Every structure is written in structure tokens, then in C-alpha cells.
């Protein structure tokens, strides 16, 4: 829950997180920038793909079995990356709405800071590279190449935000430069995974960008 508005879910993880086909995170209670009020609509416990790092309970042995949070990420997407690795080794994650935590969003980097944009794009691409099944990797990365540049130019032309425009370009450039550093880990993850792919209930088959911007589906309940 948000400290600023106690009746609203918090952006970072709301009531449990999922991914779309192309790696865009969304939550019960938050889709992109649309954050819902808590009206009891998500009061049931649910299996999720990821939980926010702001409020997560995990067995120590499981944390260290996947080498914990990846410190190279610094911030943003690092908990999603770890949760995905946990899922590949056969663990399941649940959101339990009976517990309630109030979180101050943007404490590390405030919204509007180009570094926040940079880390979100770079780390999200890195997370995909580390964890996607081999048969999906090249297709998803090609689509993301297109979507990322559409996002960059939309930011520049419609929002006149030069800082975020440059941040997205730098994020893609730096991802291409440092992805080889993660190649050994990727091979290890693929070799040791006990689940061939994440269920479509947790990593969906739809494109969240299309659903949100073209179909105007702004809340979790409205998604396919």
C-alpha cells in the first residue's frame, strides 16, 4: 500500500506481480502508471510470478540457492529477476493480502529521474536475457528492440523529454555491451531449470503495451 495514499496500492508491487510475453511487469492493482484503489477486489491469496522487494519473505536456503539478488542491477527489476530464477528451480511465490505493508515509492530514485528510466530498461532487458527459454529469446528480443525505440521516440516527440529519450538509448547500448557477462549464467539457468516455461497465467501471452494503449484496458481485471 502507498504511504502517500493509504487507500491505494503501491506502484512497486501492488498485490502481486506478473509479466507479459515481452517482459513488461504488471500487478494486481497496478498496470503501467494506472494504480487502483484497494476496494477489496484482490483480497484472495494468489500465486504470482514475482513479489516486490519492498515486502518479501523467502527461505534463506532458497535465496542462496539462486545466489540472491543480482547486485549488478543496483535497482529496478532485480527482485523480478530473482523471483523468475526461483520459479525455474521449482519454487512458487504467493501474494497474501491478509498482510499489509506501507511503502514509500521512489526512495532510491524519484520518478522523472532519467537514471530511473535507464535502469528500468537496461535491467529489464538483462532479466529477459538471463531467464527466457532459448526458443523464445530471439523473437522476444527483436520485438523489444522495436517497442523500446517506439517508447524512446514517443517520449521525445510527445513528452519533449530529452533526458528519458537519451536514457533509453543508453540502456539499449549498455545492455548490448554487457550481456556477454551474463552468458555463462544464462547457460547454467537453462541447464538447471526444472520447469520448461512459466505458466501463461503468470507470464501471459498477450502484449501489455497493446492492451493498455490500444485497447485502453487500464486495470488488472480488464486484461485478457
Predicted regions and their residues:
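Active-site-adjacent helix/loop segment of glycosyltransferases
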Residues: 89-196
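Conserved donor NDP-sugar-binding/catalytic core segment of glycosyltransferases
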Residues: 1-25
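Short helix-loop capping/hinge motifs at secondary-structure junctions, enriched
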Residues: 36, 62-65, 134
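Long, low-complexity C-terminal extensions of enzymes
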Residues: 183-224
Amino acid at each position: 500500500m502507498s504511504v502517500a495514499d493509504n487507500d491505494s496500492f503501491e506502484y512497486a508491487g501492488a498485490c502481486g506481480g506478473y509479466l507479459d510475453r515481452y517482459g513488461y511487469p504488471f500487478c494486481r492493482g497496478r498496470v503501467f502508471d494506472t494504480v487502483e484503489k484497494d476496494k477489496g477486489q484482490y483480497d484472495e491469496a494468489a500465486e504470482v510470478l514475482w513479489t516486490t522487494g519492498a515486502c518479501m519473505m523467502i527461505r534463506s536456503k532458497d535465496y542462496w540457492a539462486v545466489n540472491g539478488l543480482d547486485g549488478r542491477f543496483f535497482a529496478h527489476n532485480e527482485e523480478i529477476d530473482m523471483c523468475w530464477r526461483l520459479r525455474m528451480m521449482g519454487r512458487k511465490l504467493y501474494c497474501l493480502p491478509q498482510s499489509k505493508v506501507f511503502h514509500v515509492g521512489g526512495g532510491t530514485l524519484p520518478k522523472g529521474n532519467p537514471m530511473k528510466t535507464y535502469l528500468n530498461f537496461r535491467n529489464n532487458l538483462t532479466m529477459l536475457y538471463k531467464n527466457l527459454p532459448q526458443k523464445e529469446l530471439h523473437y522476444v528480443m527483436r520485438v523489444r528492440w522495436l517497442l523500446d525505440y517506439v517508447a524512446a521516440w514517443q517520449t521525445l516527440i510527445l513528452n519533449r523529454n530529452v533526458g528519458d529519450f537519451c536514457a533509453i538509448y543508453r540502456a539499449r547500448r549498455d545492455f548490448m555491451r554487457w550481456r556477454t557477462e551474463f552468458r555463462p549464467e544464462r547457460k547454467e539457468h537453462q541447464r538447471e531449470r526444472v520447469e520448461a516455461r512459466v505458466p501463461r497465467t503468470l507470464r501471459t501471452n498477450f502484449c501489455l503495451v497493446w492492451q493498455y494503449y490500444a485497447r485502453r484496458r487500464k486495470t488488472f481485471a480488464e486484461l485478457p
